[in-house]
Design a protein with these regions (language model features):
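Long, well-structured alpha-helical subdomains associated
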Residues: 2-118
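Accessible peptide chain termini
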Residues: 1-2, 164
């Protein structure tokens, strides 16, 4: 009917909006201190790039839109499986599994204690030891995001205080 046709006409635009919002907004506008929304955007960007549906050169960003949905679903399946398995394991083991999922796509900070392997005293201790070992910027921005942030910094600064 007419409502379904209108909804379908806008569905593709919603896909673009969600992808661009997730990839760009938090990664370059937020603080780097334990900014997990930014890590989510970085993860999505890297996943799409590593699975051949996002392509970046020094001056051009392109998407293979026909393959994007399939790859977003594949990443979602990995995350859903992580959460599904969480019911069968202790919290700290789940945290380690979550870290490995992110680390399988994003490169952790070279000084990361998590990436090097948490010491036995942390592994055997309270959950606070795990969270205290996380660096403020555990997964630093990639070169793509560094270059984008540098180019966008003046634009972002010019919008400070604007409310809509």
């Amino acid at each position: 009917d007419e409502v379904d046709a209108e909804t379908l006409a806008h569905a593709g635009l919603v896909q673009y909006a969600v992808i661009f919002d997730r990839i760009f907004r938090f990664a370059i506008t937020g603080t780097r201190v334990r900014n997990y929304d930014a890590v989510g955007g970085q993860l999505l960007f890297a996943w799409l790039h590593q699975h051949g549906v996002l392509h970046w050169t020094d001056t051009s960003l392109a998407f293979d839109w026909d393959g994007v949905a399939e790859q977003v679903i594949a990443l979602s399946d990995k995350i859903n499986d992580l959460y599904w398995r969480s019911i069968d394991r202790p919290k700290m083991a789940h945290w380690l599994a979550a870290y490995e999922l992110v680390r399988s796509t994003l490169t952790p900070h070279p000084a990361s204690v998590w990436a090097q392997g948490l010491p036995t005293e942390v592994l055997a201790g309270a959950p606070s030891g795990y969270t205290n070992a996380v660096l403020d910027d555990e997964f630093p921005l990639s070169m793509f995001f560094e270059a984008l942030e540098k180019k966008m910094r003046p634009v972002i600064a010019s919008t400070e205080g604007i409310r809509g």
